[in-house]
UniProtKB/Swiss-Prot annotation:
Signal sequence annotation: none
Organism expressing this protein natively: Homo sapiens (Human)
Annotated stretches, region: Interaction with ORAI1: 71-95
Cytoplasmic side: 1-106, 151-231, 315-331, 772-804, 856-874, 927-946
GO CC terms of this entry: basolateral plasma membrane; cytoplasmic side of plasma membrane; cytoplasmic vesicle; endoplasmic reticulum; Golgi membrane; perinuclear region of cytoplasm; plasma membrane; trans-Golgi network membrane
NCBIfam families: ATPase-IIA2_Ca, ATPase_P-type
Gene that encodes it: ATP2C2
Protein name from the UniProt record: Calcium-transporting ATPase type 2C member 2
EC assignment: 7.2.2.10
Amino acid sequence: MVEGRVSEFLKKLGFSGGGRQYQALEKDEEEALIDEQSELKAIEKEKKVTALPPKEACKCQKEDLARAFCVDLHTGLSEFSVTQRRLAHGWNEFVADNSEPVWKKYLDQFKNPLILLLLGSALVSVLTKEYEDAVSIATAVLVVVTVAFIQEYRSEKSLEELTKLVPPECNCLREGKLQHLLARELVPGDVVSLSIGDRIPADIRLTEVTDLLVDESSFTGEAEPCSKTDSPLTGGGDLTTLSNIVFMGTLVQYGRGQGVVIGTGESSQFGEVFKMMQAEETPKTPLQKSMDRLGKQLTLFSFGIIGLIMLIGWSQGKQLLSMFTIGVSLAVAAIPEGLPIVVMVTLVLGVLRMAKKRVIVKKLPIVETLGCCSVLCSDKTGTLTANEMTVTQLVTSDGLRAEVSGVGYDGQGTVCLLPSKEVIKEFSNVSVGKLVEAGCVANNAVIRKNAVMGQPTEGALMALAMKMDLSDIKNSYIRKKEIPFSSEQKWMAVKCSLKTEDQEDIYFMKGALEEVIRYCTMYNNGGIPLPLTPQQRSFCLQEEKRMGSLGLRVLALASGPELGRLTFLGLVGIIDPPRVGVKEAVQVLSESGVSVKMITGDALETALAIGRNIGLCNGKLQAMSGEEVDSVEKGELADRVGKVSVFFRTSPKHKLKIIKALQESGAIVAMTGDGVNDAVALKSADIGIAMGQTGTDVSKEAANMILVDDDFSAIMNAVEEGKGIFYNIKNFVRFQLSTSISALSLITLSTVFNLPSPLNAMQILWINIIMDGPPAQSLGVEPVDKDAFRQPPRSVRDTILSRALILKILMSAAIIISGTLFIFWKEMPEDRASTPRTTTMTFTCFVFFDLFNALTCRSQTKLIFEIGFLRNHMFLYSVLGSILGQLAVIYIPPLQRVFQTENLGALDLLFLTGLASSVFILSELLKLCEKYCCSPKRVQMHPEDV
C-alpha cells in the first residue's frame, strides 16, 4: 500500500518510468501519505515497548522509566498506545491449560472396579459362547458409564462457572483522565493510582508515594507489611527487598501511591509463579466427606450381602457365572456410588441459582454452612446503609447552625443558615465557608458522573462543597503530605500550602470529635481564632451527642499551622440512610432464628438510632462499646455478646474478638462488611460476606461470599438456599437408600429360600440407572421449600441420616420388598421356574415402586398436593422418561431379548400401578399424621427429625 503511494508520488513529480507520464501529487494525498507513515512509525515504536524486569525497573529514574515505556506520567497512555500494546502483550490475565480431553475423561470411568468386573463377566460370556449375555452386559456397562460421565462432566462445567467471580478492578490514568477499569485491561506503561484496600493489579514501579505500606505476605510469606518508596535503588538485590516495586496480587494496607505498570499477565512475577503451579484438586466439603464415609460403609455392607448371596447360590447348585454376573450387577446397583456426585451437583446448582440472584459463593462448603448460620454480624456503613453519604447538618465552632438539602453525589441542593433560611454560597459566611473548605481539602474523593471515586464520607463532603460552589478550592492548594485515616487513630490530615501566596504551611484535619479536639488549642469565631475553653469543648460535645442521636455520623474539622496548634472549625452531620429492604430482611432473618448484630465504629447515639431504624430489636437495644469488649474477661465475653445487638466504637481487633466470642458460645457466625477494617473479621467468621460494588479488594479476598449488587436482603435468599439444599440432599439419600436396601433384600431373600432370581443382571443395571440417574438427580434440584427457611438453624452436628429418616427409609424399603415379592410369588409357576412373564411383572413392579417412592421423597414434611406436581419440571421429565424407557424395555422386541421381558396387558400395568402406589399413599399418610398428630413444639425443637 505504501509502495503504491510512493510510486504515485514519483509519477506526479514527473519522473518517467516505463514510458508513462507522471502527474504532481495532490495536497490531501500528500498529507494522507505522511499520516500513514507516521502511524506506521508509531506502531513500530509501540512494538518496541516490552515488559521490564523488576530488578531493572527499580534502578530507573522516573524520567528514564517514562522514556522506556513511552508514557507521560501526568496524562498516561493514549487509547492508540493501549490498543497496540494489547496486541503485543495480550490481556493482563492468566489462562490455565488444564483441560483434559473429553475422551480421556470418558475412558477414566472404566477404571471403576465394579465396571471392570462387569466387563470381565461379559468376556467370560463370550468365551462360553453366551453372546446375547455378553452384548447385554456390554450395553449396560456403556449406559452406566455414560450416565456417570455426563454427571461428572456437568459438575465440572458448573464448577468452572463458579470461578468467574467478581473481576478485580483498578484506577488508571489514561489520556489525562483517571478511569476505573478492570485489571485485565492494563498494559505495560499504564499509570495506575493505588489507595488503601486496593489489590495491586500488575507489577508496578512506583513514581509517587504517600506513607505506602503493602501486605506482600501472599508473595513473600512475611506477615509484616512492607514500607514503599518512589526513589530509585542502587542495587538490585532480592525481589523481596525492592522497595519501589509493588507486585501483582499484593494488597495496599496503608497510604497511597502511583506508578507505571512494568509487567502484566504471565510477564509479572505472579505470572512466573503461575507458570510453575500445578493444578490442585478442589478439597471436598464436610458434607461430601460424610457422604463418602456413608458410601463406604454401605459399600462394605453391600459386598458382604452380595458375597453371601453368591456363596448360598453356588452351594445350592446354581450356575456360578450366572450368580457372579448377578452379584456384580447387584453391587453396581446397590452401592450408592452416585451419592458424592449428587451432593456435588446439588451444591453447585444451588450456588448457580444463588449467582442468578446476584450472590457469588466462592467456596462450595459455604453453601451447606449457610443452613447452620445462627448469628449475622454486620458492619453498618455501606452494608446496612445505602453508602450514599449525605451531609444534612452543619454546626460551626462559634455556634451557627445550617441545614443542607439534596441527597447523593450530584451536587444538587442548598446550604441554609438557621433560623433565617439564608442560602450560603462560597464564603458569604466565613465560619461555614472555612468549615466546608477544610472538608474539601482534607479529602481524596473525586465525584464523576454523580458517582464517588473514593470513600463515601469524603464524597459527602465534596458534594457539600459543590452545593456551596467551593469544590474547586482544593485546586488552590499544593498537597505536601498526607496522614491517612485508620481505624486506630480515627482521623486523617493533609499538609498543604497555597499556590498563589507565599505563606506558611497549613494542616487540615477531619475525624472523630474526641480525637480531633485533642489537637486543637483555638476555635474559629467568625474568622478570628480564639482560645478553646472548657465551655466551648462542652458545647461541641453536646452538639455531637445531639446530632448522633438523630442517626447522623458526626465529623469534626480543624485547621492550623501545626498538628498540636489547630483551630477547631466545627461539626458536620452526615446521614447514611438504611438500604432499601434492610429492615424487612432483618425481620425475616430474626423470624428464621438468625440473630442480627450491628458492629460499627460510630458513636453510641448514632449506632442506636440506626439500630432502631432497621428494627434490630423490638424491645430495648443492648449495646456494648469496643472498650468494654477489651475489658471483659474472655469467658464472660462469650456469655454477654449473645445478648448484645449493637457494638459501637469498634476497631478491627474488636470485631475479631466479638466473632471469636460468638463462635466460642457455639454460634455459627456470618459477617458482612465492605472495608479494609472488616477483612480480619470476614476471614475469621464461618461465613464472610463482602459487598461487590462498594467493597474493597481486601474485603472481597477475605470473604467466602460476595453480594454483587450490595443487596443485604440477598442474604435471606442465601440462607434459604443453604437450608433447602440440605433438605434436598436428605430427600435424595432417602430415595437412593430405600432402593438399594430393597434390591439387596429382594435378591437375598430369593437366594436364601432357594427361589429363582426375581431380577436378572440387565434388569438390576436398569434399576441402577433410575436410582443414580435423572429421577434421583432431579430430587437434588427440588425448588427450595419456603417452610425450610422458617426452621431454626440446624446444628453442624446434625447428620444426614437422622433417626426419623432411617425409619422412613426402612418403611419405604419394607413396602417395596413386600409388594415386589407378592408379585414374584403370584406370577411364579408351580414348578418354581423363572419365566419371562414372572421376571417382567416383578421387574416392572419394582420400577413402578421406585418411581412412586421418588414422588413421595420430594419432601419429608409436605404432601405432594402442597408442593405441587408441576413445580419441579426436571422431576416430571425424568419420571416420564423412565416410564417411557420401561415401556420400551417391555414392548420393543430387540430390548425384550436384552432384558428377557415379554409384553404385558393393560390390566397388568394398571394392577402394578395400583400396587406400587401403596408406597406413595402410606408415606403421604405418615406425613399427614406427623403434621396433625405430632406436637408443633417438638417439630420445631428437632427440625432434623422432620
